[in-house]
Amino acid sequence: MGRKRALDRVAMGCCVAAMPPEAFLPVQHDKSVRAKKTTSFLFILHIDNFFIIPYAESSRVPNETEERKMAENMVLSFDGTKLFVNKEVDMDCRAVCVIVHGLCEHQGRYDYLAEKMHEMGFGTYRFDHRGHGRSKGTKVFYSAFDEIAKDIDVVVDRAIAENPEAPLFIVGHSMGGYGAALYGHLHPGKVDGYVLSGAWTRDNKGLGTGAVEADTPDLAYMPNELGDGVCSDPSVGEAYMADPYVIKEMSFGLFRALHKGHAWMRENASRFVDPVLILHGGDDGLVAPKDSLELYEQIASWDKSLRIYAGLYHEIFNEYDKDAVIEDALDWLNLHADLEFIDVEEEEVEGDE
């Protein structure tokens, strides 16, 4: 049975969807607190430096305490792959968010965002993608463009089963934004809305072009050189590269799989109909803001909003102005969590009579 939110079109104001793209001017923020001067740049993968790993799992060696926690928090995905899930949900939470992380990173990098959600009464489910963090699977690799959505579905089903009365949202960043957006295309109406951050839905920047065109095996790997482009705060990039759970290489096969997904979403944009807040850094050098603009223009949702933050890099939830960005996301989630449920199937039957 479908899950859908009843939206008061008068109170919400359908002008959100009707506003032309030029109405979404970059959001200006105080530059005085910036860690360093921000300049736009183009990030290009150097595909001449690659190596082959026939099979590898994400393999930081956990200690005994971590092993116990991992065993307790593992769920089986559609093909039996074990995914690590970090559940933080109070009995009286007013809504639940599934947080989906980006390429090469892990769910633990979203501690601050999750903490802010908990303060607002939201429960969270965070998981490591297959081949990432504490999850099992071939390292940083997908064999098909929809594997990420199938993994998300396992976590969503668990969240629904454990919180049947709570509104449910998906918050996805970068590759996690790709996965969240793809999930919305494949499962319209299953969750109550989406927040997308720097979502890699189109690849207008050409981040994966070299990998797609390279004459290399899918299980060939290139170095992860994303650290300098994730945030204008150098300490965030340094912590990213020093983090033992951030994987320092990525497969050509993953880029090829997601490239197919980008094309599929372009061709099937009308399938996305759910409420969505699309956020992007205006100086994102990894994923072009144009990706989010095109997604906004092409999807069929009438309840959709786009915000592009001038001067912010890729990881807007970690940027110098992160609290303002998170506040925007929480305001949107709070509004949509307060809307009443309707039953999609029953409404359709009544409409046919």
Model-derived features with residue positions:
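Short beta-strand/loop motif that positions the catalytic acidic residue
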Residues: 278-280
